[in-house]
Design a protein with these regions (language model features):
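Residues on the lipid-exposed face of transmembrane beta-strands in outer-membrane beta-barrel proteins
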Residues: 70, 81, 127-135, 141, ...
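Outer-membrane beta-barrel translocator domains and adjoining extracellular loop/strand segments
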Residues: 91-98, 151-158, 206-212, 254-261, ...
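Residues that define the transmembrane beta-barrel architecture of outer-membrane proteins
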Residues: 75, 121-125, 174-180, 212-218, ...
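Transmembrane beta-strands of outer-membrane beta-barrel proteins
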Residues: 75-82, 139-141, 193-197, 218-220, ...
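Transmembrane beta-strands of outer-membrane beta-barrel pores
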Residues: 83-89, 143-149, 188-192, 199-205, ...
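Outer membrane beta-barrel transmembrane domains
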Residues: 241-328
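Short loop/turn motifs that connect adjacent beta-strands in outer-membrane beta-barrel proteins
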Residues: 24-26, 67-75, 131-136, 189-195, ...
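Cleavable N-terminal export/targeting peptides
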Residues: 1-57
C-alpha cells in the first residue's frame, strides 16, 4: 500500500471540504421585502395622495395612526419565494487532520496542506414568511435549500514519507444542505426617497460537515420610488423602486467533518484502503476574502398584493437575486 500518495490525496480532499461559506447564506437569506413602510404615498405626478384603501388591521401596531397621516403602508403579511446565485472567494488559513487509529497518529503532524485560490459557487431556493409588526419594522423567518460547488487549487501537499510535495492539485467539491433562520428590516422614507436596513441570522446544515454553519448578514439600502398609472384597473398606482446598497457577511470560520462524507475524485482511489483502517477527521479554519460587496436592485409593485424584486451584487462578491411576493 502506498501511504504517501494516499496521504497527499486525503489532504487535498479535506482542504476543499471546508471551502464552503454560506451566506452565500444566504443568504442567503437576505432582505427579501423592499416594500417601504413609512413612505408617504403619492400620485404619479409626485403630489401627496390620500391613503390607499385598507381596512383597519391588528398589524402593524400604530398602523391606523400612520394611515391617518397619509402614509401608504403595505399589507401586513407576506409570503415569498426567492432564488439566489452567489459566487465569492474563500481564503483557507489552516487544515488539520485527526486519525482515530493510533498507528496513523504521526500523520497528523506530517501531513501539511497549503491551499491556493478557492472559489465557491452556490444556488439557494428560499421560502419566506414575514409581517410588519410596526409601520417601520418587518420581522420574518426563512427556510430553504442550498447546493453548490467549491473549487480549489492546492499549491503544495506534504505527506508522510514523500520525497517531494505534491503541487498544483485541482479539486472540486460538491455540497448541499438546508437553511433556516430569521431577521428584521427597518424601513423609512421622506417624500419618494427611502432607506432600509436588513439584518438576518441563519444556520445551514451541509451534508459534508459536522454541525451547522452560522451566518450574519447586514444589508443597508437607499433608493427612490417612481409612481406610474395603474397597470391593472382598480389596483392603485404601479410603483417602481430602485436602490443602491451594500452587503456585509460574517460566516462561521471553522469547519469539521469526516473524510468519508466527501465525494472524492478518482485520483483518491487509495483512500478506500485507509478508510478501512481508521476514521479521518478534518478541521479547517478559513475566512471570506471580502466581507463587503456592493448591491443594485429594483422592485415592481404590480398590485398591492403582488410584487417582483431583483438585486445584483458586484465588486468583491458576485450575486443575482430574484423573488416574487404575495401580500395579504
Amino acid at each position: 500500500m502506498n501511504f504517501t500518495n494516499t496521504s497527499k490525496l486525503l489532504a487535498a480532499a479535506l482542504c476543499l471540504a471546508t471551502s464552503y461559506s454560506y451566506a452565500d447564506s444566504e443568504r442567503p437569506l437576505f432582505s427579501l421585502t423592499m416594500t417601504e413602510s413609512g413612505v408617504q404615498q403619492t400620485n404619479n405626478d409626485g403630489s401627496l395622495a390620500g391613503a390607499t384603501k385598507s381596512e383597519s388591521r391588528i398589524l402593524p401596531i400604530w398602523g391606523d395612526a400612520a394611515r391617518a397621516k397619509g402614509y401608504d403602508l403595505p399589507e401586513p403579511f407576506g409570503a415569498s419565494y426567492s432564488y439566489m446565485n452567489l459566487r465569492q472567494d474563500i481564503v483557507v488559513d489552516s487544515i488539520k487532520f485527526e486519525f482515530t487509529n493510533p498507528i496513523f497518529k504521526p500523520w497528523e503532524k506530517q501531513t501539511i496542506v497549503n491551499a491556493g485560490k478557492t472559489r465557491e459557487k452556490s444556488e439557494t431556493h428560499m421560502l419566506k414568511l414575514d409581517s410588519w409588526v410596526l409601520p417601520f419594522l418587518n420581522v420574518y423567518g426563512v427556510y430553504g435549500k442550498t447546493k453548490g460547488t467549491s473549487k480549489t487549487n492546492l499549491d503544495t501537499v506534504y505527506a508522510p514519507g514523500a520525497y517531494e510535495p505534491w503541487k498544483n492539485l485541482p479539486f472540486e467539491l460538491n455540497f448541499k444542505g438546508k437553511t433556516f433562520g430569521g431577521g428584521i428590516t427597518l424601513a423609512g422614507g421622506y417624500n419618494q426617497f427611502f432607506a432600509t436596513l436588513d439584518t438576518n441570522y441563519t444556520r445551514t446544515n451541509l451534508d459534508i460537515l459536522d454541525g451547522d454553519i452560522s451566518a450574519l448578514v447586514i444589508t443597508p439600502r437607499v433608493g427612490y420610488e417612481f409612481v406610474f398609472e395603474p397597470l391593472l384597473a382598480g389596483q392603485g398606482n404601479t410603483k417602481v423602486q430602485v436602490w443602491v446598497g451594500a452587503m456585509y457577511q460574517d460566516i462561521t470560520q471553522r469547519f469539521k467533518g469526516n473524510v468519508s462524507n466527501l465525494d472524492l475524485p478518482p485520483e483518491l482511489a487509495l483512500f478506500d484502503m485507509i478508510k478501512k483502517q481508521t476514521d479521518i477527521k478534518f478541521d479547517v479554519e478559513q475566512h471570506l476574502a471580502h466581507k463587503w460587496n456592493n448591491t443594485l436592485g429594483a422592485r415592481i409593485e404590480v398590485t398591492r398584493n403582488f410584487n417582483i424584486l431583483s438585486e445584483v451584487g458586484f465588486g468583491n462578491r458576485n450575486s443575482f437575486f430574484i423573488s416574487g411576493e404575495f401580500r395579504f
